[in-house]
Amino acid sequence: MEYKILQPERRGSLLLVTINRPESMNALNTAFFDEMDHLIANDAADPGLTAIIITGAGKAFIAGADIAEMVNKTPAEAEAFSIRGQATFRSISTTAVPVIAAINGFALGGGLELALACDFRIASNNAKFGQPEVNLGLIPGYAGTQRLPRLIGMGDALYMLTTGEMLTAADALRIGLVQKVTEPEQLMEEVLRIAGVIASKGPDAVKLVKFVTRQGYQVSLAQGSQLEAQSFSQLFGKQGTEGMKAFLEKRKPQW
């Protein structure tokens, strides 16, 4: 596929994906979902990857879904549009390696929902966050009502969802919506640093710990603990054994 909206760039074992529709503040449309589906199924499936970074070009991460594309949809078409977006974002969250949202500027509506589908979020201090759908007489359609309370708690989530108010980066950090805040000019440097730290760890362990943590969050503690024990054991005789030997021998592991 020839990408027109996404700009994927391989940097060693990292994949940097820039959403490049700055003239529309990177608003999400059908073409975006087509390209992201292809990227996740192909570029992001490379076993040599250690992390994926998603960011936006220009003044916004993503300012929301493309309202001009949605306005004339029938209820049936709107449901299909919602289901399609949910599937794409689910594929992002279930990608084998960690996915980091580098949030510059506005992350609103569908843009915040995409950020929620990532494993964690790093923001510049001029970023703004919100689920403003109620201002248009709508609700989120890409699982925002489900992921947001799971991440920040029911009270803060319902406040954002029912008021449509925007949060500053400082507020987002306070409630756990983002993990770090930087100066705008330092955002990508910090995200690349974090991705580099991840790349230095045992790659099989990183993939497994993401899988077990996400899967375990959806089942009982007993079921999640069983999954953890099974996954823990898979690393013995492989990279886990190499890592422990390297520690004892005071050398760097050879993954």
Regions found by a protein language model. Give the residues of each.
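Conserved CoA-thioester-binding segment of acyl-CoA-metabolizing enzymes
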Residues: M1-A57, R90
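C-terminal alpha-helix plus adjacent terminal tail
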Residues: M1-G12, D46, G164-A170, E185, ...
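A general structural signal for well-ordered alpha-helical segments in protein cores
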Residues: G12, F33, G64-I67, G85, ...
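Terminal peptide-recognition signature
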Residues: V17, R21, M36, I54, ...
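Phosphate-coordinating loops and pocket residues in cytosolic domains that bind phosphorylated ligands
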Residues: A27-T30, A63, N72, T162, ...
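Hydrophobic alpha-helical membrane-association signature
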Residues: F32-E35, F81-R84, L114, L187, ...
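Glycine- (often His-adjacent) and acidic-residue-rich active-site loop
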Residues: A45-G48, G56-S91, A107, V219-S220, ...
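Crotonase-fold acyl-CoA enzyme core
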Residues: S91-D204, R251
